[in-house]
Amino acid sequence: MSQAELNGELFTLERFPPNAEEEALQAWEAADEYLLQQVNDVDGLTLIFNDGFGALACALAERNPVSINDSFISELATRHNLRMNGIDEESVRFQDSLSPLPAAPALVLIKVPKQLALLEQQLRALREVVTPETRIIAAAKARDVHNSTLALFEKILGTTTTSLAWKKARLIHCVFTAPKLADAPQTYSWKLDGTPWTIHNHANVFARSGLDIGARFFLQHLPSDLEGEIADLGCGNGVIGLQALAQNPNASVMFTDESHMAVASSRLNVERNLPDDIARCEFMVNNSLSGIEPDRFTAILCNPPFHQQHAITDHIAWQMFNDARRSLKYGGELYVVGNRHLDYFRKLKRAFGNCTTIATNNKFVILKATKVRKQR
């Protein structure tokens, strides 16, 4: 938790979920400050894209902005920081990146996302609603503004210029000129080797153009013939849960992720590949397993992320492991795949009191931890 002066006011801002070990990481950056220096002469409907922890929404709450994000955790972070600063949450309208945008905004502020495909999807959505009078400004660390970034703005929206760097941040200014643009598919699709399935990914889903090598390894070692409920935690495009659905015909599968596009991709992949099994599925956008009742699942399958936006972190994995222990039935099992260097074995041993190595190769390890009653 720290204080930031934004738009002439002092705000207390915190990363989310709160994590004492990462207090050195700020919930805002120079790119936020730089953006806010540009907006005081613009009135009207304001759209904010990819506001990681709500710094922009807090500073501009009096405008009643619309905050658009694929990340549910970013929405939770924004709500948390609004409350911490005594700002009514209802002053900001939240929507995900797949929902239609409001028409004719006066001001569009974009924090350039890590995934260029997500930026393209958002710019294409903006193309449908902006006007030549709309002020469009994007910002990022200077090192993250590439020629390819500028070319995307130019191709989709129109005339694009960039600013000088300030505190290692850079702005992108864009004027909508409606350049000719070929249509693009709504999802990326590819065949999953060894199956009749075609996998469909929305723009912000990890490994959208093919199966990542960690998931490929994990697919070879999933449990079979289970009953009860299985969770695909951090489901991404749902390929792990899809295979679990096929291998466990007497079980149901929950697909859950903090990315709206991930959960939408998972639903689409079940609908397209195993439509007769959709009744055995649940799809949930969530912060890990928050709010899920204890002692529910027979098994949880997890490939934890170790990045939050641009920061490397292990607190998301810790949260997933602890949530999994709470949500598993006694005797239930958590299966985890991860890079060997992340040392998940030690973390799982600490969280569960036990851990078994299922398989390993030169890069990845698959681990299993069982929920057991603690010895008195």
Swiss-Prot record:
Q: Which UniProt keywords apply?
A: Cytoplasm, Methyltransferase, rRNA processing, S-adenosyl-L-methionine, Transferase
Catalytic reaction annotation: guanosine(1835) in 23S rRNA + S-adenosyl-L-methionine = N(2)-methylguanosine(1835) in 23S rRNA + S-adenosyl-L-homocysteine + H(+)
Principal location: cytoplasm
Alphabetized GO MF terms? 23S rRNA (guanine(1835)-N(2))-methyltransferase activity; nucleic acid binding
Which residues does UniProt call coiled coil?
A: none
* Statement: the UniProt record of this protein carries the keyword Plastid: no
In terms of Pfam families, this protein maps to: MTS (PF05175)
Q: Does the keyword S-adenosyl-L-methionine feature in the UniProt annotation?
A: yes
Which parts pass through the membrane?
Answer: none
- Enzyme Commission number(s) from the entry: 2.1.1.174
Q: Which compartments is it annotated to reside in?
A: Cytoplasm
Q: Which GO terms describe its cellular component?
A: cytoplasm
Q: Which cysteines are joined by disulfide bonds?
A: none
Q: What class of enzyme is it?
A: transferase
Q: Which family does it belong to?
A: Belongs to the methyltransferase superfamily. RlmG family.
What is the stated purpose of this protein? Specifically methylates the guanine in position 1835 (m2G1835) of 23S rRNA.
What HAMAP family does this protein's entry cite? 23SrRNA_methyltr_G
Protein name as catalogued: Ribosomal RNA large subunit methyltransferase G
What species is this protein from? Klebsiella pneumoniae (strain 342)
List the lineage, top down.
Bacteria, Pseudomonadati, Pseudomonadota, Gammaproteobacteria, Enterobacterales
